[in-house]
Amino acid sequence: MDKRLLSLGLALAGTAAAAQERPNIVLFLVDDMGVMDTSVPFLTDGKGNPVLYPLNDWYRTPQMERLANQGVRFSQFYAQGVSSPSRTSLLTGQDAARHRVTNWIRSEGNNRDDYGPYDWNWEGLGADDITLPRLLREAGYRTIHVGKGHFAPFGHSGEDPRDLGFEVNVAGSSIGEPGSYLGENGYGLLRGTRSRAVPGLDKYHGTDTFLTEALTLEALAQVDSAVAAKEPFFLYLSHYAVHNPFEIDKRFSAHYQDTTYSQAARGYATLIEGMDKSLGDVMDHLEQLGIAENTLIVFLGDNGSDAPLGGSHDIGSSAPLRGKKGSEFEGGTRVPCIIAWARPDSRNAWQQKYPVLQGAISREIGTIMDIFPTLTLLSGAQAPLPPAHTEDGYLLWSFLRGDKNPWHEDTFLNHFPHQHRGSYFTSWRHGPWKLIYYYNPDHPDYPQCTLFNLEEDPSETHDVLRQHPRIARRLLREMIDRLRRDNATYPVDFEGKPVLPREDAIR
């Protein structure tokens, strides 16, 4: 950590420890990090006990372990399958079928493919949309964006996170990946992919400051500024890591010398550990400022793993889960989520009102849409929303204190009417059952469905549709009803006509 930040933090600590009107919030978002990209075991056995797998031994994330010991981690937490849909869901509390940002957003414009819907929301979020940072800012929070944005294309209002409710924006733009992680390369401006150069970090150009470290330093400086102004803050620290390019973070390369892994896989592992160090730096800084007990941390991945291990649909990058980022399988949408107070203290008034178990695992189904209502309640930013803005998320506070929530549905909709590793599909999970519907827009009269029991077959290796056709038909009806409710957009056939899901697809 920068010694200047440490000195400033110690100077501010004496004035920050007093009780404050509202808690601070740190949303620590990691790009392309799946649930297995960590030494923290998220997956459990039938009794709810954590199970270590080989990937947990490969990655080194001691700070995630530290955070998990302080709070609750979710074994079944879902995000959308690619970046922009998830980030839009995070800021709006709506699922992708409803907000229609159903694919990743290309900076240069509409990236619709041959059978993709004409009316998907390729323009992303805009200045008129209701967003989490906008509500928090209106409630008196200093809203800070540091890192990846990817909310809208170049030239559209949502390109700049400040148009979405953030008071401060550092390094956020329309780009979805960095041109380079290396300060020597100007993060893509001097060398690398210039069209994906990370903006706003010129003072680090030509130095050996890795991008993850630069963003961390900038985030801590912004926290210092908010504390000095005695303002509650919402820090949205959105790392470009661990998205490709899988450049090696030399600070951690000595830990990954096993040549049975490719250079890309070793580079990916260093990106993971660099992200983890950033988390620890943030936690340490909150302690030094004396505000840790008044600060909630939400750690989250934005979609499934893109680790360069195995193929797109096999059990490799997310083992024992199948698939990876952009696929229809669990490895494409299951993400790490840890929620904890930065310093647990049962005497703290905020922690008494919003208790979080320590070292606990929740096996309840949670989704990225749940973050919106959970944080608006905590912050006091709850306000009557316009009827046009319907939330799809539910409060997580019951789960965080170890209780059930009868109002929280055990469902997850993943609607992806585009081409990727998994193409033109909708998946619908309800309880242990998961239905995948393939539209097959090139042959729309022949849709396909598969059914998995995730409790018995979490690796999705056994399609049990023929054994349970009644369950499959019930899930199909539920899925169609949900898509209709959301006014979803669909793939099109070769004539440009929407290909809607068919209730007779399962006979």
Question: Where are the regions that the model predicts?
Answer:
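Short, structured active-site-proximal loop/turn typified by the sulfatase FGly-forming signature C/S-X-P-X-R
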Residues: D45-R87, G93-A97, R142-I144, L164-S173, ...
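Hydrophobic h-region of N-terminal signal peptides that target proteins for export
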Residues: G9-A18
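A short beta-strand-to-alpha-helix junction
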Residues: P54-T61, Y78-V82, D119-I130, H205-A214, ...
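Long, internal low-complexity/basic segments
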Residues: Q20-P23, V30, V35, R73, ...
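Metal-dependent active-site segment of extracytoplasmic phospho-/sulfohydrolases and closely related
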Residues: P232-F233, S238-H239, G274-H313
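Loop/turn elements at helix/coil->beta-strand transitions in domains of secreted/extracellular proteins
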Residues: E21-V26, N69-S75, E138-I144, L164-E167, ...
